[in-house]
């Protein structure tokens, strides 16, 4: 279970609604914390005055704190390795600039006794310079990748994030269930809670992961990568086709 965009002014009511259900079943989450949030689109509620205090309590419970970038400002038009759109906080920037951003974010979390060597890229976007910078700063895990199971590459562990929706439990895979509390609809929230209630026994924490690299791992990564790229291309084509159709219909009307 993973929460993105954790910041002091997110929708805390929805977050605690989900958190209460997770703790009912002793499920530990991954919390993607934006160290210095400057993205105004993520500020939807009143400021949580005990933001870092809450995070420390979550960490004591067993939740994992991941560094979700630095400021969450997309100041690059590069999509990087896994990004779906050409907007990034990291990909496309020079190596030293990426080191500086990551270092500043790490320093903030370390000051609050919250840093762990786990990186969650804003917009799922990063490049080879990002990975080089992460290793320089002591990170060992990246919460992204196209694969059915976690894998290790270039001395970094990658935990796949295939879908933001609950996947059928019969699928032979392990993926992060990604939640954005600011944008989840009432219908989606209800479905998510139902899914957790019904399938709580299948949730695991990062500590329980066993990562093995072999021939099947390589095949898995290649196959899922091709499949995801095809799916994204199909979505873009379908969206483009729908736009053209409606414009033509309006023209004829």
Region spans (language model):
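Active-site beta->alpha N-cap acidic-glycine motif
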Residues: 1-61, 108
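Acidic-and-aromatic substrate-binding clefts and catalytic sites of carbohydrate-active enzymes
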Residues: 6-14, 35-51, 77, 95-96, ...
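Generic structural signal for well-ordered alpha-helices
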Residues: 15-19, 52-56, 102-106, 131, ...
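C-terminal domain-boundary segment and adjacent tail
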Residues: 26-33, 142, 183-253
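Short, flexible, mixed-charge acidic loops at enzyme active sites
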Residues: 73-85
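Catalytic domains of cell-wall/extracellular-matrix polysaccharide-remodeling enzymes
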Residues: 89-161, 189-190
């Amino acid at each position: 279970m993973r929460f993105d965009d954790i910041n002091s002014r997110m929708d805390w009511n929805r977050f605690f609604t989900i958190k209460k259900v997770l703790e009912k079943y002793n499920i530990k989450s991954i919390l993607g914390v934006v160290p210095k949030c400057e993205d105004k689109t993520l500020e939807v509620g009143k400021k949580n005055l005990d933001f870092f205090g809450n995070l420390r309590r979550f960490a004591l419970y067993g939740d994992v704190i991941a560094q979700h970038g630095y400021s969450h400002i997309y100041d690059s038009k590069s999509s990087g390795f896994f990004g779906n759109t050409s907007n990034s906080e990291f990909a496309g920037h020079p190596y030293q600039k990426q080191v500086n951003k990551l270092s500043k974010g790490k320093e903030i979390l370390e000051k609050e006794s919250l840093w762990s060597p786990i990186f969650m890229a804003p917009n799922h976007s990063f490049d080879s310079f990002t990975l080089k910078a992460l290793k320089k700063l002591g990170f060992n895990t990246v919460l992204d990748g196209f694969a059915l199971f976690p894998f290790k590459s270039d001395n970094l562990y990658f935990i796949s994030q295939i879908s933001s929706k609950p996947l059928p439990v019969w699928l032979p895979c392990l993926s992060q269930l990604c939640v954005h509390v600011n944008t989840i609809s009432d219908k989606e929230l209800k479905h998510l809670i139902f899914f957790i209630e019904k399938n709580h026994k299948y949730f695991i924490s990062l500590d329980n992961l066993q990562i093995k690299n072999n021939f099947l791992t390589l095949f898995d990564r290649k196959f899922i990568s091709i499949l995801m790229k095809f799916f994204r291309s199909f979505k873009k084509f379908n969206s483009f086709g729908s736009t053209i159709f409606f414009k033509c219909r309006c023209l004829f009307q």
